[in-house]
Amino acid sequence: MLFTVSHSPYHCDLSALLRLVTSEDAILFLQDGVMAVLKNSESLNLLLNNQASLFVLEDDVIARGLCGQISDSAMLIGYTHFVDLTLKHQQQLAW
């Protein structure tokens, strides 16, 4: 399953999300959700304790002036790779 997180980690329950994910899932952070994968953040520490693949939309990182502040644990992707993720994961859950 592809989980898309578009809200700041301060306005969504990442712990609840992480109870649902498996090692076969992917989590894509976009819009304000990109703040969840900031280096040394509490939300990143939660995310690193699961086995899902982490992705972050590069355009949203740039738009928020967060270049260089995103953890290397999350892969920066563009819209083309976003489409690839939706094709790979037939089911999607917006968080």
From Swiss-Prot:
<comment type="subunit">
    <text>Heterohexamer, formed by a dimer of trimers. The hexameric TusBCD complex contains 2 copies each of TusB, TusC and TusD. The TusBCD complex interacts with TusE.</text>
</comment>
<dbReference type="GO" id="GO:0002143">
    <property type="term" value="P:tRNA wobble position uridine thiolation"/>
</dbReference>
<comment type="function">
    <text>Part of a sulfur-relay system required for 2-thiolation of 5-methylaminomethyl-2-thiouridine (mnm(5)s(2)U) at tRNA wobble positions.</text>
</comment>
<keyword id="KW-0819">tRNA processing</keyword>
<dbReference type="GO" id="GO:1990228">
    <property type="term" value="C:sulfurtransferase complex"/>
</dbReference>
<dbReference type="InterPro" id="IPR007215">
    <property type="entry name" value="Sulphur_relay_TusB/DsrH"/>
</dbReference>
<dbReference type="Pfam" id="PF04077">
    <property type="entry name" value="DsrH"/>
</dbReference>
<keyword id="KW-0963">Cytoplasm</keyword>
<protein>
    <recommendedName>
        <fullName>Protein TusB</fullName>
    </recommendedName>
</protein>
<dbReference type="InterPro" id="IPR027396">
    <property type="entry name" value="DsrEFH-like"/>
</dbReference>
<dbReference type="InterPro" id="IPR023526">
    <property type="entry name" value="Sulphur_relay_TusB"/>
</dbReference>
<comment type="similarity">
    <text>Belongs to the DsrH/TusB family.</text>
</comment>
